[in-house]
Each structure stands twice: as C-alpha cells, then as structure tokens.
Amino acid sequence: MTFISNLADTRLAWGLLFLSALVLVAYALFSQHAMGLQPCIMCIYQRTAIFGIMFACVPVLAANNMLTRLFAFTVWGISAIWGGLIAWEHYDIQNAANPFFATCEIVPNFPSWLPLHEWLPNLFAATGDCGNIDWVFMDMSMPQWMMVVFAIYSSIWFVVLASRLIGNRAI
C-alpha cells in the first residue's frame, strides 16, 4: 500500500498518466483525420474528459507539492468519472431500442466563455452521429472501449487517493 501511496509523489507516475491520455488523444485524432471517422458530440465530450486528465497532470509535473496534487486529484477524478458517465450515455444511445428517441445535441454545449468547438474546431467540432457505430475492435464499439478506459482511470484515481488518505499522507 505504501508503494501505491508514494506514486503521487513521483513525477514519473504523473508523466505516465499524462502520456496515456496523450496517446488516447493522438489515436482519436488519427481516427478522425486519417481514418475518416467523424466524432459526435459524445465523442467530443469524452475527448474533453481525456484533455481534463492531461490538464490535471501539468501542474504536478511543473511543481509537485500538496497544492498541485490536490488540484490534480480533483480534476483527474472529475474528468475520469464524468468521462465514464458520458461514455455510458453514448453506449446507451447506440444501443437504444428506439433510435428515434435516443439523440444527442448538434452543437457542443461548452460554456460561452470557453467555446472550444469554435476556437479549436479540428479538436472539438462534432460532425458525426452519436447513434452510428462506425468502429469496432474485439467486438466492442468506441464508447464501450472508452467506458473501460475511464473505469481504469477512475479505479487508479480511487486506489491512489484512498491509499494516501488511509495512510494518513497529505494529498
């Protein structure tokens, strides 16, 4: 348990977390721009959650102290859990009994002060349909894989955070 608790003190662990999220974003962009898969709103929200995990790592990589770790754990946990819920909702849309009632928005619902889809359309513009299953790997669609990814991120977050709290360590 001490080993797990000590992971949050190392930049290597935070760097690996950042790198894992970067690989997922790189594959998403490859799927979009090289394979021609069009991301839907739910895909964009999941991509935003992955960017949230990447963003959470940056302060700790710059200066690993209690304040940056508190920020990182908070943003990481919110992003991982929110991403998992979005992936679950996306899966439900794709497998709805009546697809006419399972729809998603046309334009991303980003805050007016942060219109990512307008500022960075190559990353955050949604052009696909949430109900389409255009990609399958090992009998699982993209939302199913993202549920697995976010479950792993959430589980690691919980285990590391719990081990620090149980071991009476500062965040």
From Swiss-Prot:
NCBIfam families hit by this protein = PRK01749.1 (NF002485)
Query: What are the annotated disulfide bridges?
Result: 40-43, 104-130
Task: Please report the record's description of how this protein sits within the membrane.
Answer: Multi-pass membrane protein
Could you say which protein family the record assigns here? Belongs to the DsbB family.
Q: PANTHER family from the entry?
A: DISULFIDE BOND FORMATION PROTEIN B
- According to its UniProt record, where is this protein located? Cell inner membrane
Task: Give the Cytoplasmic membrane side ranges.
Answer: 1-13, 64-70, 164-171
Return the HAMAP family for the record.
DsbB
Question: Per its database record, what is this protein's job?
Answer: Required for disulfide bond formation in some periplasmic proteins. Acts by oxidizing the DsbA protein.
Which keywords appear in this protein's UniProt record, sorted alphabetically?
A: Cell inner membrane, Cell membrane, Chaperone, Disulfide bond, Electron transport, Membrane, Oxidoreductase, Redox-active center, Transmembrane, Transmembrane helix, Transport
Tell me the protein's name.
Disulfide bond formation protein B
Per the record, the domain of life is Bacteria
Q: Which organism is it from?
A: Pseudoalteromonas atlantica (strain T6c / ATCC BAA-1087)
The protein's gene is named: dsbB
Q: Name one GO cellular component term.
A: plasma membrane
Q: What molecular function terms (GO) are annotated for this protein?
A: electron transfer activity; protein-disulfide reductase activity
Q: List the Periplasmic topological domains.
A: 31-48, 89-144
Q: Where are the transmembrane segments?
A: 14-30, 49-63, 71-88, 145-163
Q: What is its main location?
A: membrane
Recorded hits in SUPFAM superfamilies, A to Z, give: DsbB-like (SSF158442)
UniProt GO BP: protein folding
Recall the taxonomic lineage recorded for the source organism.
Bacteria, Pseudomonadati, Pseudomonadota, Gammaproteobacteria, Alteromonadales
Pfam families found in the cross-reference section: DsbB
